[in-house]
Amino acid sequence: MTGFDIRERRNDIGLSQSKLSDITGIEQARISAYELGKLDLSVKEINKIANHLEKIDETAVLKLKKKRFQNSDHLDSIIAQRPRREFSKTKRNKEYLEVLKNLETQFTNPPKTGLKAVSFFAGCGGLCYGVKAAGFEIVATNELVENYKAIYELNFPNVNFLPNDVQEITKSDIDQILKNHKKIDLMVGGPPCQGFSLAGKRDVNDKRNTLFEYYLKIAEQIQPKVILIENVRLLTSMKDPNGSLVSKRILDTFEKMGYKSNFYNVNAKDYGVPQHRERVIFIAVRKDLKKSPSIAETKYGNSVNLFNSNPPYFTFGDAVSDLEFLESGETSKKDEHHWAVNHPEHVIRWLVDVPEGKSAHDNIDPNLRPPSGYNTTYKRQVWKEPAGTVATTYGMISGCRNVHPIATRALTTREALRLQSFPDTFKLTGNDGPIRTVIGNAVPPLLGFELAKFIKENYML
């Protein structure tokens, strides 16, 4: 969980740094500095904050504002007073589920290509899921956060884990990989970028500034045929503490390493993921292959090729319309990951009549508007459009575009997984807070598959 994530989640639930400090026992000054990117908290401290944020009941937090909502505990449920809403399967729900089933099949029984890949900053394995399904054997990986690593190991039980901290990976670790596997064809990963900023004013000594450098240093030792880096799209505008564009530094380093490289802005919805999710992808190709870097063509939505008309984007409804309809506080009897947070009644009243694509902040009646926040918060998704970006706060109704299009509640974990293109057989373990964080930060497996499949077909065969 980054400092930005903590600040965003605190603001969403109206929790001050001082209160968070009291709850966790972590000094407020340290929390503040971490949110500003000026120092690193330990993994133990970050996990402690994440767990406490998840456990905090929104009602308890909002009692701090009891003067505004002093009668909220005595309101009759407005949902119970109305006919129960419902939805039916969309025409393309079956098609989308077949896409996920095919992805699962290829992950379970991947093509026998003999191609080897390594992964760093693996998270729960979203990118690796797609890479394996495309026909690459993941022979080594690393992940710092134990909660995320536990989920990864459930789904990739035979992968060799390198030291959790990428800065602790030694030359002998790399030599052992090369000894065991002779060569590595593909290296993938998403080094964190919190040490950089748009203005280049972050602390020069911030350890996170070096994570990209460690990733590239490891790549130089391994010398894979192709290197892939995934990150937030904003990275292309970020600067290091010396004022240089991070993207240029990366490209220059690839050049010195003997690679041709470029970066591409992509949106996951163009590759079959039912979600607007903009990312930047760096592709570096070893010069001896005598090929230039490129990226997979889009497969869905408006096509730039007049002779190859792409099918429409998959939508929110296409992804989830076969699931049980749930209102606030309800739980599916069929799926342990499909349950809805029980939201305060006054929040339900703010949102119950809000149409798709609109926010409670847009309500004409000022008494039905949240007291603070932006109009992207308390906002409904749209059923017949790709979902907004699934964030780490998807279970918080006050978050950014987290409200279900039809039900008056935040998204469930199953819905978030579907919108991220994880097949239903993907396994989870741990507390809800870390699970939500790692799902919200994951690379959609379907995007990873299309990128890796293109790399295989254009640079490996």
Predicted feature locations:
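Recognition helix of helix-turn-helix/homeodomain-like DNA-binding domains
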Residues: 25-41
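Core alpha/beta nucleotide-donor-binding catalytic domains of modification enzymes
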Residues: 70-223, 233-237, 243-245
